[in-house]
């Protein structure tokens, strides 16, 4: 065995959804934008994504982020989100977790007021997080996400075994195909994970056939990667219960941060909620929630959009210093699907 590379990471979870924060070891090009940093990673360090997200260090549902230096004084840090298959434009559960981890581990200076503000550069745009802390305790993160909007409504498709359904295409930091399961027999619960994953991938392909995806102002954003199933909540006080199916069929354990942003835009467009009306969202596990609110309107080019905020908590799981032998194909990462 010959150790070729060593990388330090922090592990967290946000209402059950994991995050591997890669904060050292990558020599990002000086002065590069976040898109240039992602291209650099794709070309030179995609092996690291695979090694940390996949087995034997990760698993099929692992999620991660490269915490990068800022590209300008307008930002405090950059975030490039990853999983075992690909890259994501943004991630809300990850933003909650990485912001809390940065404050807890001294990766950012704490504001004496007890509320530390962190400006993140993502490939979806500027995301501003506020982390509340008291003494040694880090309490919660609230972030203002990129603007959200509804791109298309009532996209008809057939879901095998569950009949004809409709989806809305909504941007909330990623594009989501949002599907109402009320009236079907499919329930959102951990014991139904395999079926939810399978149906999510089928639904995503059906929606992709029906609509062209293109962000109004960001030319590089043109993909539908997430499908959200929702129905009535099981936790009192929540507006809905949902699960987000993404990438190779992963299931988000948390209520979803970009997902909560998209769901608020979805419900606002349908007249269910209004601006400045707080909501609570429930995730797959039925144990944790996020708080959300649309704090105003804006535009994306000529398209009306809303400004979502999401609040949640994350827990520290531990740290690791990984050695990686790229000459060993198993050590370099594999998936069993």
Curated annotation (Swiss-Prot):
GO molecular function, one term: 4-hydroxyproline epimerase activity
Ligand binding (substrate): 92-93, 252, 257-258
Domain of life: Bacteria
One protein family per Pfam: Pro_racemase
Reaction catalysis annotation: trans-4-hydroxy-L-proline = cis-4-hydroxy-D-proline
Protein family: Belongs to the proline racemase family.
Protein's name according to its UniProt entry: 4-hydroxyproline 2-epimerase
Source organism of the structure: Cereibacter sphaeroides (strain ATCC 17023 / DSM 158 / JCM 6121 / CCUG 31486 / LMG 2827 / NBRC 12203 / NCIMB 8253 / ATH 2.4.1.)
